[in-house]
């Protein structure tokens, strides 16, 4: 349960949500991403109060405006890296040529052009997370929500993933909201927001 949360995130900002288990981090992330609806209040993103959208409108809004990155990658094991990244585009009505060009672009961006035909089982954890980041980017969303994106990675690989997220913010102008338990990961963001028992207790610059 979240209580009287007031949080402003600027376009092109990298925000880390921190707090103990059960503090409301994932709940807040789900609300921001339009997965859950609040019982009261507003969630305004890009001038749209997504709390007022119908389920169908919300699904369309998510598909066009939000990219998701998860701790355990959530890649389909029977699909290649290329096909995993292409999945969100199958809902957009783009033709095959446009889809393939876009997938090639984002795989190049995350440094995996040479792994496009590999299956998840043939990729390291860091490579799988890069595929997941490419999938999050392929529809060119303004907002990216990341739930413990380095939680299943070793320190060095985690740093590489965080550097990539930083690149998305500073070079592409993406907005990233990231849940993490790791203070070092949170320090890579521009701002840290601390939650306890559903209450926003502190905000501070990460640097």
Residue ranges of model-derived segments:
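H-loop (His-switch) and adjacent beta-strand-loop-beta switch element
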Residues: 192-204
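ABC family nucleotide-binding domain
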Residues: 1-195
């Amino acid at each position: 349960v979240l209580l009287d949360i007031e949080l402003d995130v600027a376009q092109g900002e990298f925000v880390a949500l921190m707090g103990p288990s059960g503090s409301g981090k994932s709940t807040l992330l789900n609300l921001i991403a339009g997965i859950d609806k609040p019982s009261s209040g507003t969630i305004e993103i890009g001038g749209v109060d997504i709390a007022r959208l119908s389920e169908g409108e919300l699904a369309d809004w998510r598909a066009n405006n939000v990219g998701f990155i998860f701790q355990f990658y959530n890649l389909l094991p029977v699909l290649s890296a290329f096909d995993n990244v292409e999945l969100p585009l199958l809902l957009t009505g783009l033709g095959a040529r446009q889809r393939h060009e876009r997938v090639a672009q984002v795989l190049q961006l995350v440094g995996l052009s040479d792994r496009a035909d590999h299956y998840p089982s043939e990729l390291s954890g860091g490579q799988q997370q890069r595929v997941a980041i490419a999938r999050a980017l392929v529809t060119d969303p303004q907002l990216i929500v990341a739930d413990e994106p380095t939680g299943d990675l070793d320190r060095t690989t985690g740093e590489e993933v965080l550097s990539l997220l930083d690149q998305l913010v500073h070079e592409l102008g993406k907005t990233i909201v990231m849940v993490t338990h790791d203070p070092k990961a949170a320090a890579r963001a521009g701002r840290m927001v601390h939650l306890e028992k559903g209450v926003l207790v502190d905000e501070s610059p990460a640097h």
